A protein has these predicted regions:
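Extracytoplasmic loop-helix module adjacent to an early transmembrane segment
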Residues: 22-69, 81-82
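Perimembrane helix-loop-helix junctions
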Residues: 198-228
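Membrane-interface alpha helices of multi-pass inner-membrane proteins
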Residues: 177-202
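Transmembrane-helix motifs of polytopic, lipid-linked glycan transferases
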Residues: 97-121, 125, 163
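Membrane-interface micro-motifs in multi-pass membrane enzymes
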Residues: 122-169, 192
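Start-transfer (signal-anchor) and selected internal transmembrane alpha helices
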Residues: 1-22, 123
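Short hydrophobic/aromatic helix or loop-helix immediately within or flanking a transmembrane segment
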Residues: 66-90, 94
Length: 229
């Protein structure tokens, strides 16, 4: 019991160190480039006269509809960016640091779920290694994790993708989960043109595997794929 408590304390310390360091980096990362465009209802790629701030859900939807027509359909990522651009930067710093922490924890959790649980005693070490790998190998971490416009499109959508995958891999779920897994799949599918199609394909293959190996097809999973597409 004592050994278990010590591991939990070390685990929490690793998480605290990571979230603190990422918060500090977020704190010193300023607004730049696209951030200023997403402060307002989107009309065109560059700021112009008579810009209108996003003041309501209707404004946000209008902005994203314009964005879809003019630029691209990254509804999820740019909605996240526009929401945070209406508040003090510190609000984003706190949430973004937590989301980066969630990315590492999800990768750790999925790796054990997919491969094996027998090495759980080394979980703290694995988690620390995961964050070191993320630090060294994430492409342009300043643009994909710290910059608001980049983080909303890459970090946040990656977490949604992994969360959806984790839900799919779980068995014996409550039928009521569909109330939140379908919206989750929708927002994951509306992430970006790189990871969204890849995860839709991956989860479609998982559904196909279940259909062949276990002679069953989950209706909720099929509905999730439809929502994501």
């Amino acid at each position: 019991m004592k050994e278990k408590n010590n591991k939990e304390i070390v685990y929490l310390l690793v998480c605290l160190v990571v979230v603190t360091l990422i918060y500090l980096l977020n704190h010193f990362t300023l607004y730049t480039s696209d951030d200023f465009v997403y402060r307002f209802i989107y009309k065109e790629p560059f700021p112009s006269d008579n810009e209108q701030p996003v003041r309501s859900l209707f404004d946000l939807i209008t902005s994203q509809m314009n964005h879809w027509k003019v630029w691209n359909g990254r509804f999820t990522g740019h909605s996240i960016v526009q929401i945070f651009m209406q508040y003090n930067k510190e609000v984003f710093n706190v949430f973004n640091s937590s989301v980066f922490l969630s990315l590492g924890i999800l990768i750790d959790s999925l790796s054990f779920e997919i491969v094996s649980n027998k090495h759980r005693k080394h979980q703290v070490l694995y988690l620390a290694i995961i964050f070191l790998i993320l630090w060294w190998f994430l492409p342009e971490i300043g643009k994909t994790v710290l910059w608001i416009s980049g983080s909303g499109n890459y970090l946040w959508t990656a977490v949604l993708d992994l969360l959806w995958l984790k839900v799919v891999l779980r068995r014996n779920q409550s039928p009521y989960n569909i109330l939140w897994t379908i919206p989750l799949a929708f927002f994951s599918g509306a992430g970006n043109e790189n990871t969204s199609p890849a995860f839709i394909l991956l989860i479609s293959l998982i559904i196909l595997y279940d259909a062949v190996s276990e002679k069953r097809v989950s209706v909720s999973r099929v509905l999730e794929i439809v929502a994501a597409c």
